[in-house]
């Protein structure tokens, strides 16, 4: 099916805005879409001087503005989604412009029959919006149509994966997102991450600022960047942030949705998802613990990603040699770092031999570690796959794998995320460890952030390039949390190329070069600002040894 997105400016003149909407709908119809997505605040602008202005510029649900949009939907036989401000009372009794009216920011969907089939009030209001607008009871229901199931978001609701996830859990396959946003992260990072995490397409229609408004308030000029994002996070179509226009893309909505979401090893999402695990409440007392944590948080910690190319005993010796000749606080190794072919773990006899080797390597590595120095990896202990932290005294902490995956279907699963206080030479930090597919569940990072984790250590085996290109970056940005993740190097087809693989002629297949992907270190350098991709300090794992600094003290500012 074809999806079209319109990007344009609005003014404070409602009739002018209606004319603009109709003009852009007619422009979009030229590409023959089945659904057209329009931006946020189609009838007005986001800023208001007082409550009287907010009321005057808001629409009646049965008024001319929406009636004309309904006519366009019926005339062109397509779905039209737009976001407007709606009056929720018949009249405004108050004469005082400083007294608030019942006005909502509402997204409406009109069917090809010209009927209003869905309306949803914006739930995540910014401070300036809360002053003028209300929101009704939240709904996370997807909208069932002959095309597929649609999910509706507006504005800053896309800054959290939770909103997209809630819609996806309720069956959404295409997220229609109306924006009037300045956030670069929403367009450059979050949309791609949320699409990958939830196996949904995301069509975002953003605003450009009206010329008169730009002159009066240049700082509020919207970033625009309307776009359509595919299931793998690749951008199918985008529009420059200062241009009025239409973009469109053809999507296969039958492939979308969490019910059809699979990991590369064939593990189904529904076999991994564990809602009971994400209900874990904050484990630590807030006020007293926070004060104590702040007083002893180290400013920095030295970390290294170490990915040996060797196997078995030689791999262990390789790690020990590095430890003896370096002073890193935390040496992060990949998942089961000494095994190149993880499939051998599915052989019962070999699994016993692997566990024996794991016991030996704990002793061997601990003998060369200095005080306040640690190695993080994953091992097989007591028949279970688990992340481990090794100190000079042996095992310091363990974290059993929490989510099922076919790669390690033999392992028992843990039932809670452990929050570990890790002593370093300059103080202590809170850490959590994630291995296998655990980090693919954003809810688990929510639990870590709720419990004031400064650094997440990840011994993992990368399965898709989107994990490091989008997902892990978005986790760090959303929660302002440092991530240290190490994997053996893998090669994947470029996301855009793989998205269009059916269009590639057989003779040109060799021209599509696989892209190498590994782990990374994501550092938070200034938690006082709104974090976007360009505000994260990211160091990609390169070669055998990748050294980096992380700043746990900056993560505290977000608690």
Language-model regions, residue ranges each:
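Short beta-strand segments enriched in small/hydrophobic residues
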Residues: 1-9, 290-313
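Conserved hydrophobic/aromatic positions in well-ordered beta-strands
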Residues: 4, 108-110, 227, 247, ...
């Amino acid at each position: 099916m074809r999806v079209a997105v319109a990007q344009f400016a609005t003014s404070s003149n409602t009739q002018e805005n209606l004319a603009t909407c109709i003009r852009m709908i007619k422009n979009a119809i030229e590409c023959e879409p089945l659904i057209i997505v329009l931006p946020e605040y189609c009838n007005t602008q986001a800023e208001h001087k007082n409550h009287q202005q907010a009321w005057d510029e808001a629409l009646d649900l049965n008024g001319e503005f929406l009636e004309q949009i309904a006519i366009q939907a019926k005339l062109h036989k397509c779905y039209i989604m737009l976001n407007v401000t709606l009056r929720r009372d018949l009249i405004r009794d108050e004469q005082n412009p400083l007294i608030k009216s019942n006005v909502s920011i509402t997204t409406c969907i009109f069917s090809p029959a010209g009927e209003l089939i869905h309306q949803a009030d914006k739930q995540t209001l910014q401070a300036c919006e809360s002053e003028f607008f209300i929101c009704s009871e939240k709904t996370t229901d997807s909208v069932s149509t002959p095309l597929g199931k649609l999910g509706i978001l507006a504005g800053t609701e896309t800054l959290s994966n939770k909103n997209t996830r809630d819609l996806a859990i309720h069956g959404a396959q295409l997220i229609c997102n109306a924006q009037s946003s300045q956030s670069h992260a929403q367009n450059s990072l979050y949309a791609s991450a949320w699409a990958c995490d939830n196996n949904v397409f995301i069509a975002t229609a953003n605003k450009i600022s009206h010329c008169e408004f730009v002159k009066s308030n240049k700082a509020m000029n919207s970033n625009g960047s309307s776009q359509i994002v595919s299931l793998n996070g690749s951008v199918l179509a985008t529009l420059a942030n200062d241009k009025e226009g239409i973009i469109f893309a053809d999507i296969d909505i039958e492939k979308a949705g969490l019910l059809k979401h699979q990991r590369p090893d064939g593990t189904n999402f529904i076999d991994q998802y564990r809602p009971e695990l994400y209900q874990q409440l904050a484990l630590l007392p807030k006020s007293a613990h926070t004060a104590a944590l702040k007083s002893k948080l180290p400013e920095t910690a030295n970390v290294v990603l170490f990915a040996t190319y060797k196997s078995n005993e030689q791999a262990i010796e390789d790690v020990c040699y590095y430890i003896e000749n370096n002073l890193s606080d935390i040496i992060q190794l990949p998942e089961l770092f000494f095994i190149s072919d993880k499939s051998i773990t599915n052989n019962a006899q070999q699994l016993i031999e692997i566990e024996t080797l794991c016991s030996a390597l704990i002793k061997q590595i601990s003998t060369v570690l200095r005080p306040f120095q640690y190695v993080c990896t994953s091992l097989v202990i007591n028949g279970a796959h688990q992340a481990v932290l090794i100190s000079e005294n042996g095992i310091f902490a363990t974290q059993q794998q929490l989510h099922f995956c076919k790669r390690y279907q033999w392992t028992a699963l843990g039932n809670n995320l452990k929050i570990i206080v890790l002593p370093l030479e300059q103080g202590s930090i809170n850490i959590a460890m994630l291995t296998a597919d655990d980090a693919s569940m954003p809810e688990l990072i929510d639990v870590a952030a709720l419990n004031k984790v400064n650094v997440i250590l990840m011994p993992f085996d990368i399965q898709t390039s989107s994990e490091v290109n989008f997902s892990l970056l978005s986790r760090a940005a959303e929660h302002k949390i440092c991530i240290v993740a190490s994997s053996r190097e893998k090669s994947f087809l470029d996301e855009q190329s793989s998205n269009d693989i059916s269009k590639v002629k057989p003779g040109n297949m060799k021209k599509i070069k696989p892209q190498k992907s590994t782990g990374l270190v994501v550092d938070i350098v200034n938690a006082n600002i709104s974090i976007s991709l360009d505000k994260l300090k990211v160091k990609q794992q390169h070669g055998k040894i990748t050294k980096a600094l992380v700043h746990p003290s900056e993560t505290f500012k977000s608690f």
